[in-house]
Amino acid sequence: MEMERINENTIRVVIGNDDLTERGITVLDLLGNHKQIEGFFYSILEEVDVDHQFQDNDAVTFQVLPNRNGLELFISKNTDEDDVADESQGDASVDSEHPDQVSDQIKEHLLEKDNQKDFFSGFKSAANESNDIEDYLNDSGQPTTTRVVKLHSFEDMISLARVLRLENAASNLYRYQDAYYLELVFFVNESSRESIKDELAVAYEYAERTKVAPDVLAEHGQLIMDNSALELTRFHFLGNS
C-alpha cells in the first residue's frame, strides 16, 4: 500500500490486490457490503493518518477509483474551498456517512465508457456477450440445463475463469451464506452432451457439487455477476487474458 499527501486536505492511497487480500476483502465485496465498506475505509484512514489530522475531522469524504490492480482511494477533509470543488466534481466524492453510495460509485467507475478506454473495451465485449445470452435466456422456446457449483474461495473463481471458456452457456456468480456459488446455464440446442460434460469436468476441478438450488440462490443469494460471470472475472482480474 502506498500513500501520497496531495495537499493539506487530501491523501491519495494506492491499495493493491495483495493489500485487499491481506484484509480479507475484494472489490466485489465493496459492491454490496455497506458496513464492510465503511469499516474498510476507516481502517485505511487510521493507518495513513498518523497525525490524526483527518480522523478528528467530522466531514471526511472518500473517492474510489477501482482498477485492474486494486483501488486508488482519495481521502479528503472538507473545508469551504473543498465544498466549492465538490460542486464541480459532481458525484466524484462520497460522504463517509453514506457508504451505500460507494458501491454505486464503484459500479459506475467499472462501467465508465469514456475513462481508461483500453480497460473498458474488454468490459464492453463482455457486456455484449451478456446481452446475447440474455436474449437467449428470455426465449422460452430455447431449452436449458442448469448446474450449480460451490467455490472454495473467490481465488478459485479466478482460476476457473482462466481455463473454462464457455461457448454456449451463461454463468452467474452468487454469494450466499459466506460462500461463492457459480450457476452454469447450458443452452441445450447449442451444445452437445459431451461438451457440457467436459465443461462441468473442468468446473469440478475448482469447485464442488452442491445441493443448493438455483431458486435458492436467486431468492436468498447476492447476485455479483450476471450472465457472463466467467468472462467478467477474466476481464477484471486477469486482464481479459
From Swiss-Prot:
Tell me where on the tree of life, at the top rank, the source sits.
Bacteria
Q: Where is this region: Disordered?
A: 77-102
One GO MF annotation is: protein-macromolecule adaptor activity
Biased composition range(s): Acidic residues: 80-89
**Function, as annotated:** Enables the recognition and targeting of unfolded and aggregated proteins to the ClpC protease or to other proteins involved in proteolysis.
Provide the assembly information.
Answer: Homodimer.
Q: What protein family does this chain belong to?
A: Belongs to the MecA family.
Q: What is known of its domains?
A: The N-terminal domain probably binds unfolded/aggregated proteins; the C-terminal domain interacts with ClpC.
> What is the name of the protein in this document?
Adapter protein MecA
